[in-house]
From Swiss-Prot:
Broad EC category: oxidoreductase
CDD domains: NmrA_like_SDR_a
Reported uses of this protein in biotechnology and industry: Hancockiamide D displays potent cytotoxic activity against murine myeloma NS-1 cells, suggesting a potential antitumour application. More interestingly, hancockiamide C, the likely end metabolite of the hkm pathway, shows potent Arabidopsis thaliana seed anti-germination activity, but is inactive against the monocot Eragrostis tef seed, suggesting that it could be a herbicidal lead targeting monocots. The herbicidal activity of hancockiamide C could be due to its phenylpropanoid-like structural features, which may act on the plant lignan pathways, and hence warrants further investigations.
SUPFAM superfamilies: NAD(P)-binding Rossmann-fold domains
EC annotation from Swiss-Prot or TrEMBL: 1.-.-.-
Taxon lineage: Eukaryota, Fungi, Dikarya, Ascomycota, Pezizomycotina
InterPro entries: NAD(P)-bd_dom_sf, NmrA-like, NmrA-like_oxidored
Biological role: NmrA-like family domain-containing oxidoreductase; part of the gene cluster that mediates the biosynthesis of hancockiamides, an unusual new family of N-cinnamoylated piperazines. The NRPS hkm10 and the NmrA-like reductase hkm9 are proposed to convert two molecules of L-Phe to the intermediary piperazine called xenocockiamide A. Xenocockiamide A is then converted to hancockiamide D via a series of hydroxylations and O-methylations.
Residues involved in NADP(+) binding: 12-17, 38-42, 59-60, 80-82, 137, 161-164
Entry keyword set: NADP, Oxidoreductase
Protein's UniProt name: NmrA-like family domain-containing oxidoreductase hkm9
Length: 335
């Protein structure tokens, strides 16, 4: 155990992103992890406790609760659930919560603030597309940048979750892939085209996301002000289904929808931003993370830094590929 450990507090610790960050940091004896949650008795909270995290109940809308939760923290990672039922159009909004988190973290003396952010869809599309979640997160990012009490602020924008392909309930939204074959016996992945060169960024939350964020905390001054493209691999939808077919032996194909506007959300409000995402990337020529093309070199460097800090061999210091991810999660189908 090192003589000095640094406390990282995670807001949203029981979610996908926050949980991934917690599990990565808990592997490094240089860090202590405080996991904030509304329900300390939940299975996700108890799992983190079993790994060595301090579990702390906290209410994001209560300033005193947040201030106490952030007390003594060297760093903070924040991911806000944009679909939180507590948000209302007239307030409180995600931005209201984000401002309070930033203010209380700064007041508590936090030195290094990392936020899961997103670009402004309205700015990228000249007002043609407005993704509510992205707009809120981008406003919070700007608010955090303007807070001069932090030593560093850095940001990460998560790509398309590969883990979504493990959720059978999601498959019908995308033609049934990778679980339900169509009438022609194909596992068909159906969605709008991405746009531009059709280079789609994907992230494995369980394999890479937490390590990328840990890399930011390992050298926070180097990454001060940066927005990291949180992705494991970048490839086309056609390449994705080809990898799946080659790995599993099952027939698979990509069938693009003619228009992003025809993507069926089945009346689920939370899926509206998914539909608008395709409108964003088609309007911007494939841009998703901001005004610059998607890249994974930065994520790869952060992954290497974390792997080296954990003493892992070189063959475990790389981001997982989509092909490797399918090999890990989908068995070969016998002939």
């Amino acid at each position: 155990m090192p003589a000095t450990t640094r406390l990282i507090t995670i807001y949203g610790a029981t979610g996908n992103q926050g949980g991934g960050v917690a599990r990565s940091l808990l592997k490094n004896p240089c860090f202590q992890v405080r996991a904030l949650t509304r329900n300390p008795n939940s299975p996700a909270s108890q799992e983190l406790a079993g790994l060595g995290a301090e579990i702390r109940r906290a209410d994001g809308f209560d300033s005193n609760s947040l201030l106490a939760a952030f007390e003594g923290s060297w760093g903070v990672f924040v991911n806000i659930n944009s679909d939180d039922k507590a948000f209302r159009p007239a307030g409180p909004t995600e931005y209201d919560l984000g401002m309070k988190i930033v203010d209380m973290a700064a007041q508590a003396g936090v030195q290094h603030f990392v936020f899961s952010s997103g670009p402004s869809s309205t700015e990228l599309t000249n007002g043609k597309i407005r993704m509510k979640a992205m707009e809120m997160k981008n406003k919070i990012e700007r608010y955090a940048r303007n807070n001069t009490q932090f030593q560093t602020v850095s940001f990460i924008c998560a790509a398309w979750y590969l883990e979504n392909f493990l959720v059978k309930e999601i498959a019908p939204l995308f033609g049934g892939f990778p679980f339900v074959a169509d009438a022609e016996a194909f596992l068909t992945f159906r969605c709008p085209r991405w746009g531009g060169k059709e280079d789609v960024p994907f992230i494995s939350i369980s394999d890479d996301y937490g390590d990328i964020v840990q890399g930011l905390f390992l050298d926070p001054h180097r990454w001060n002000g940066h927005v990291v493209h949180g992705c494991s691999d970048i490839l086309t939808f056609d390449e994705l289904v080809t990898h799946f077919q080659n790995v599993t032996g099952q027939k698979a194909r990509f069938q693009p929808l003619e228009s992003w506007e025809t993507f069926d959300t089945f009346g689920v409000p939370e899926l509206e931003d998914t539909k608008l995402m395709f409108g964003l990337t088609q309007t911007t020529g494939g841009l998703y993370f901001g005004p610059e093309p998607s890249e994974k070199n930065t994520a790869a460097a952060l992954k290497r830094a974390t792997a080296a800090a954990l003493g892992l061999p070189r063959d475990q210091q790389t981001l997982i590929t989509v092909k490797g991810w399918f090999q890990k999660h989908f068995p070969v189908t016998p002939n």
